[in-house]
Amino acid sequence: MRNMIQYRCFFLDSTGAIRSDEMIECWEDQDAVETARDMLEHRSHYHGIELWRGARRVHMEVRLPDVPAFTIRAAHGL
């Protein structure tokens, strides 16, 4: 039986600075990425995550700020 792998999930502010971290255990990298994304979803005051397995960065993800929709219109006669 194999052991679960330990990961550290860092939570980033709007400038990309680390503001918090949490250890998680998962069977493989993809499970850890999904877990970290779920954690970020429930922590709306953070803007991104970095997921590390020891000295190897597994994943980095940053939320884009909400931008109002806009329309680009072509000028007539071009």
Regions found by a protein language model. Give the residues of each.
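Short aromatic-glycine-(Arg/Gly/Cys) micro-motifs in beta-strand/loop hairpins
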Residues: 1-19
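Short acidic, gly/pro-rich beta-turn/loop elements at beta-sheet edges
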Residues: 19, 34, 59-61
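A short, exposed loop/beta-hairpin motif centered on an aromatic-Gly-Thr core
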Residues: 17-28
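A short, charged, amphipathic alpha-helix used as a generic interaction element across diverse proteins
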Residues: 27-48
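Short, mixed-charge low-complexity intrinsically disordered segments
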Residues: 41-78
